[in-house]
Curated annotation (Swiss-Prot):
Assembly: Monomer. Binds 30S ribosomal subunits, but not 50S ribosomal subunits or 70S ribosomes.
Lineage: Bacteria, Pseudomonadati, Pseudomonadota, Alphaproteobacteria, Rhodobacterales
Protein source organism: Cereibacter sphaeroides (strain KD131 / KCTC 12085) (Rhodobacter sphaeroides)
Name of protein: Ribosome-binding factor A
One GO cellular component term: cytosol
Gene that this polypeptide is encoded by: rbfA
Highest taxon in the source lineage: Bacteria
Length: 137
């Protein structure tokens, strides 16, 4: 059987699948309060996305506390409990290596707001309605 390698510019199907499984596992662990830290458990944290490196040894976890406040505190607390979170992932998933977890703020909502702002711009609205054609006088 021939070995097919991923040559595209984006993540492979395996990276996407493993990232989604890690995201679900972390979301469940945080939702159930399985990390025994009252400071962490008082925050309602959304795990928006997990991006895995090609070798699946590093997982970058994009998180955002509910309301968008205390982002740095949430990342610091998650980083503090990185080992325990890795342990939960290895119990739920069968991987050759337990990925190193790196926590980053989830900027999806910021990008969404910027996109909405752009679409509400008068010039863009005129282009959308007019099909992008220039006015002729």
């Amino acid at each position: 059987m021939a070995h097919r390698s991923h040559t595209g510019t984006g993540p492979s199907q395996r990276q996407l699948r493993v990232g989604e499984l890690i995201r679900r596992t972390l979301a469940d662990v945080l939702n159930r309060g399985e990390i025994h830290d009252p400071e962490l458990n008082r925050l309602s944290i959304t795990v928006g996305e997990v991006r895995c490196s090609p070798d699946l040894k590093v997982a970058t976890v994009h998180v955002m506390p509910l309301g968008g406040k205390d982002v740095e505190e949430a990342i610091a607390l998650l980083s503090k409990h990185r080992g325990e979170l890795r342990h939960h992932i290895t119990r739920q998933m069968t991987l050759k290596y337990a990925p190193d977890l790196r926590f980053r703020p989830d900027e999806t909502f910021d990008r969404l707001d910027e996109t909405r702002r752009l679409f509400s711009d008068e010039t863009v609205m005129r282009d959308i309605r007019g099909g992008g054609e220039a006015d002729e006088d």
